[in-house]
C-alpha cells in the first residue's frame, strides 16, 4: 500500500487514525507557547493527528492551536484526531472522570478522539507526579488496571471519548485487559517507545494478533531532557548505518528512521517545534525503503529504552521487567 499523509489505519472500534502524528512533549525549559505555534504549522502543512498528554502541561496551548485553525477555516473539528492521556495519579476509578474532564477543559474540546492510560503504574496524587518533580518521592498505589479500564469504558459510553487505548503496556498487562470479564471495549492501540534501536518486533506481532495498533513515540531516539533520558546514551540520529542509508536515498537520518517504522505498519508520532522540520518530516511519504535497507535497519535493534521511567522501577506493574 502506498503511504501518504492522508493514510489512516482502521482501529478495532471502526474509528480511523492518521498514520503520522505530531508529538507535542516539551521539556520544562521550553516555552509552552512553542507548542501552540507548532500545532498551527503542522495543521497548515497537512498533519491531522495531534498527540498530547496531561503530564506535559501544554494541553491548553495545543488546544489553542487547534481551535485557531478551526476558526480560520483550515480544518473542522472532525478532521482532527486528538489523543490525550490519563496520568498515573488519576487511575483510581473515582478519579478517572476528573482526569478526563480536566484534559477536555484544558484543550477546549467536547470529546477526545483517543484517550490512553499513560503508563500501567498507578501513583498516589500526594507524591511526585513525574521525574521533574524533585521535591517529593513517588508514592506507589495498587489500583487494579482493569478497574481503571472499566471507568474509562464508562467515559466512552458517555460520549466524552471516541476510542480508548493504552501506552507503555507489556503483553501481560494487555492480556489482563483483554481477558477482563465483561470487557466492553478492547484497547485500540498501545503507544510505546519504538525506533531502530528498539524495534518492538515481538510486541508488535502480539498487538497485530489482537487487532491492536502499535503507535510509536521517540521514533528519533527521544529528546535529550535529563529528567527523563540518560544523556550518556548514544544519539540515534548519529548512527553510521542509519546515515549510510540516508545518504543512499538523499534523505535525512530522521526521515529514514521514521520511514523504517512506518513501513513496518506502525503509526509514527514525530515530535518537533521547528517549522522546517515539521514540514520536512512529511518527506517520509516521498520514498520507499528497499527490502535490503529495511533488513539493514532491523539489525540495529539493541533493546534500548531512552525513556524507561526508572523512577518507578520498583512498582509491581513496572512494564519493562518482562521481555515484551
UniProtKB/Swiss-Prot annotation:
Keyword Acetylation: yes
Keywords: Acetylation, Eye lens protein
UniProt organism field: Rana temporaria (European common frog)
Residues that hold NADP(+) according to the record: 218-281
Gene3D superfamilies, alphabetized: NADP-dependent oxidoreductase domain (3.20.20.100)
Pfam families in the cross-refs: Aldo_ket_red
Signal peptide: none
Organism lineage string: Eukaryota, Metazoa, Chordata, Craniata, Vertebrata
InterPro entries in the cross-refs: AKR, AKR1C, Aldo/ket_reductase_CS, NADP_OxRdtase_dom, NADP_OxRdtase_dom_sf
Modified residues (N-acetylthreonine): 2
An example Gene Ontology molecular-function term: oxidoreductase activity
Name the UniProt record assigns to this protein: Rho crystallin
Family label: Belongs to the aldo/keto reductase family.
PANTHER family found in the cross-reference section: ALDO/KETO REDUCTASE (PTHR11732)
Subunit structure: Monomer.
Taxonomy, superkingdom: Eukaryota
Amino acid at each position: 500500500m502506498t503511504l501518504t499523509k492522508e493514510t489512516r489505519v482502521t482501529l478495532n472500534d471502526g474509528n480511523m487514525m492518521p498514520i503520522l502524528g505530531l508529538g507535542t512533549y516539551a521539556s520544562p525549559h521550553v516555552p509552552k507557547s512553542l507548542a501552540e505555534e507548532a500545532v498551527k504549522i503542522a495543521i497548515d502543512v497537512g498533519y491531522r493527528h495531534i498527540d498530547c498528554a496531561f503530564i506535559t502541561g501544554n494541553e491548553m496551548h495545543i488546544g489553542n492551536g487547534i481551535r485557531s485553525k478551526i476558526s480560520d477555516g483550515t480544518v473542522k473539528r472532525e478532521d482532527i484526531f486528538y489523543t490525550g492521556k490519563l496520568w498515573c495519579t488519576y487511575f483510581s476509578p473515582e478519579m478517572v472522570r476528573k482526569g478526563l474532564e480536566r484534559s477536555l477543559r484544558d484543550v477546549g474540546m467536547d470529546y477526545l478522539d483517543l484517550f490512553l492510560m499513560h503508563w500501567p503504574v498507578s501513583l498516589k496524587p500526594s507524591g511526585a507526579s513525574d521525574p521533574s518533580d524533585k521535591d517529593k518521592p513517588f508514592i506507589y498505589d495498587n489500583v487494579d488496571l482493569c478497574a481503571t479500564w472499566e471507568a474509562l469504558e464508562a467515559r466512552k459510553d458517555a460520549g466524552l471519548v471516541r476510542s480508548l487505548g493504552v501506552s507503555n503496556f507489556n503483553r501481560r498487562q494487555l492480556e489482563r485487559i483483554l481477558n477482563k470479564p465483561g470487557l466492553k471495549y478492547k484497547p485500540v492501540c498501545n503507544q510505546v517507545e519504538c525506533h531502530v534501536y528498539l524495534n518492538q518486533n515481538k510486541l508488535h506481532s502480539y498487538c497485530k494478533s489482537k487487532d491492536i495498533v502499535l503507535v510509536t513515540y521517540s521514533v528519533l531516539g527521544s529528546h535529550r531532557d535529563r529528567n527523563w533520558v540518560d544523556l550518556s546514551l548514544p544519539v540515534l540520529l548519529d548512527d553510521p548505518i542509519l546515515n549510510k542509508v540516508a545518504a543512499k536515498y538523499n534523505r535525512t537520518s530522521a526521515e529514514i528512521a521514521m520511514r523504517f517504522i512506518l513501513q513496518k505498519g506502525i503509526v509514527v508520532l514525530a515530535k518537533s517545534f521547528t517549522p522546517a522540520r515539521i514540514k520536512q518530516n512529511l518527506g517520509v511519504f516521498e520514498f520507499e525503503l528497499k527490502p535490503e535497507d529495511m533488513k539493514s535497519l532491523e539489525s540495529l535493534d539493541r533493546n534500548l529504552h531512552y525513556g524507561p521511567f526508572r523512577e518507578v522501577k520498583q512498582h509491581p506493574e513496572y512494564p519493562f521487567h518482562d521481555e515484551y
